[in-house]
């Protein structure tokens, strides 16, 4: 053990043994601390609402991985996975530990990430704020008892000091905020931001490194299971309908965001859900609304003096959130794991209006679309700007994957082959024209298409290959108008459709160039018109 490692271990032990380090507090005890410390307010729903200050989302430009000899050759360095040297990290780490040692109170939670016992990550979370500790308790997997928690020897420790501000010139960061992951020292160091999601996504990034090293697929997706044990995975970026479509009263939820896929099947990495709360209503999303009760946390929502919550008010951010234990949802699998997937759904919201509402992908096409991670952003719509912008996020979650994207794509391809998984690309975006001209595909029709896919009814259906993209489109789907299945038929001007489709194909190809020679085999067989 090096001197630095010895010192940091001693400092961590000292923090954990402080009389004012509150260990494994109950929800009620944490509520009392949150309210006594003015960290949040109680709402009429029973949840507490906390403000995250000026950072109402993640700070991807302030996230670093420590460049350490045993790990540096594995990480896909670049704008997303930024390096920081070990010496710089250790100096900052010790400063943060010394800072926390001077705090009147700290909050400690021990738990797990990963509901599969063989690959479960044991965690210690040290928080400056009580509400962050409740967040950790809600989002990670909770031990059965306090006694069990005392026996946990962590594989990874989160040290969270949101009120500690870094000095970039001295500390080697880019701003006052930092999220630094060290695989050698097995720590996630967070400072300068009160956005609690950094803890959740930090551990997800760690699992996205560790699991593939054991030939286990890690995935940014939601998952559910039917009465017959049939499992479906939903991949999709923000705004594609992932949460809405995977919340099905006839299917049990495995998890809403982070999963692994090993030799036994699919398992949830988390013990909670972190749902978007903007415009939330009981009518639209009853499962999520009913989960916001005693024990849950709301982030950055607007709360009146009488405790009522206005979910439509976005004065602080569009990114309002609700964090709650998964057992706040009635319709769940316990424990949070199931068999191998039967169906994978890739969701995209195509604002260009040219991708079919549903198409069946072969393995190569699935790998291509997984690496592309396409959806559309509607930039500047509040000013009447109607030009959609394509958005590509590798693996449907580029900020969270430290290894080269082909590691994940190759694993996915192998698993699709091994378990004969049906993969569908579902467009929840526009038809009959691009945004501003066409119309949004009806949620009712999308649900019907997804339900037919998951039920297996589309497995051996009749398909036609569209001439533009080379995608396999079902000839008919029960209760869905035939006219919308092939997008060219929904456009009155066929030449405009072809021009728009060709433009999108070129954008896909340009995006794929960033992967270089490593993905030539995927582009060769999986891209459009192949």
Curated annotation (Swiss-Prot):
InterPro entries: PEP_carboxykinase_ATP, PEP_carboxykinase_C, PEP_carboxykinase_N, PEPCK_ATP_CS. Pathway: Carbohydrate biosynthesis; gluconeogenesis. Its main location: cytoplasm. Pfam families: PEPCK_ATP. It is an enzyme of class 4 (lyase). Binds 1 Mn(2+) ion per subunit. It catalyses: oxaloacetate + ATP = phosphoenolpyruvate + ADP + CO2. Its cofactor is Mn(2+). PANTHER family: PHOSPHOENOLPYRUVATE CARBOXYKINASE (ATP) (PTHR30031:SF0), PHOSPHOENOLPYRUVATE CARBOXYKINASE ATP (PTHR30031). This is Phosphoenolpyruvate carboxykinase (ATP). It comes from Staphylococcus aureus (strain MSSA476). The gene is pckA.
């Amino acid at each position: 053990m090096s001197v630095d490692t010895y010192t940091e271990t001693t400092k961590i032990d000292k923090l954990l043994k402080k009389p004012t380090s509150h260990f494994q507090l109950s929800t009620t005890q944490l509520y009392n601390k949150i309210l006594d410390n003015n960290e949040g307010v109680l709402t009429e729903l029973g949840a507490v609402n906390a403000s995250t200050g000026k950072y109402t989302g993640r700070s991807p430009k302030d996230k670093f991985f420590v460049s350490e000899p045993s790990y540096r050759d594995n990480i896909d360095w670049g704008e997303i996975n930024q390096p920081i040297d070990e010496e710089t990290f250790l100096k900052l780490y010790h400063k943060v530990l010394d800072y926390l040692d001077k705090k009147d109170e700290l909050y400690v939670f021990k738990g797990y990430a990963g509901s599969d016992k063989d690959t479960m990550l044991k965690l210690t979370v040290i928080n400056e704020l009580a509400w962050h500790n409740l967040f950790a308790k809600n989002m990670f997997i909770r031990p059965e008892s306090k006694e069990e928690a005392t026996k946990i020897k962590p594989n990874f420790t989160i040290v969270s000091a949101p009120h500690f501000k870094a000095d970039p010139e001295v500390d080697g960061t880019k701003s006052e905020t930092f999220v630094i992951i060290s695989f050698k020292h097995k720590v996630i160091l967070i400072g300068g931001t009160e956005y609690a999601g950094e803890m959740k996504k930090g551990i997800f990034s760690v699992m996205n490194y560790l699991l593939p090293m054991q030939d286990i697929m890690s995935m940014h997706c939601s998952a559910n299971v039917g009465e017959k044990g049939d499992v479906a995975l939903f991949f999709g970026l923000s705004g594609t309908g992932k949460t809405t479509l995977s919340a099905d009263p006839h299917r049990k939820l495995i998890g809403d965001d982070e999963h692994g896929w090993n030799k036994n099947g699919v398992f949830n990495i988390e013990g909670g859900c972190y749902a978007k709360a903007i415009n939330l209503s009981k009518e639209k999303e009853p499962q999520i609304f009913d989960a916001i009760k005693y024990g849950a946390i709301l982030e950055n929502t607007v709360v009146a003096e009488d405790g009522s919550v206005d979910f439509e008010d976005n004065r602080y951010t569009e990114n309002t959130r609700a964090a709650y234990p998964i057992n706040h949802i009635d319709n769940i699998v316990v424990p949070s794991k199931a068999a191998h997937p039967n169906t994978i759904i890739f969701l995209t919201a195509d604002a260009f209006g040219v991708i079919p509402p549903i198409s069946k992908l072969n393995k190569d096409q699935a790998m291509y679309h997984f690496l592309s991670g396409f959806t559309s952003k509607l930039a500047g719509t509040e000013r009447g700007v109607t030009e959609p912008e394509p958005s590509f996020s590798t693996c449907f979650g580029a900020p969270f994957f430290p290894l080269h994207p082909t590691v994940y794509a190759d694993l996915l391809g192998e698993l699709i082959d091994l378990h004969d998984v049906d993969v569908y690309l579902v467009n929840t975006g526009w038809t009959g024209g691009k945004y501003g001209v066409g119309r949004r595909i009806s949620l009712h029709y999308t649900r019907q298409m997804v339900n037919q896919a998951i039920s297996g009814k589309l497995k051996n259906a009749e398909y036609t290959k569209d001439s533009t993209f080379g995608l396999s489109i079902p000839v008919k789907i029960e209760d869905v108008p035939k006219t919308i299945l092939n997008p060219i038929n929904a456009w009155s001007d066929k030449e405009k459709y072809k021009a728009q489709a060709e433009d999108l194909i070129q954008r896909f190809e340009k995006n794929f160039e960033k992967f270089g020679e490593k993905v030539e085999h995927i582009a060769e067989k999986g891209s459009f018109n192949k």
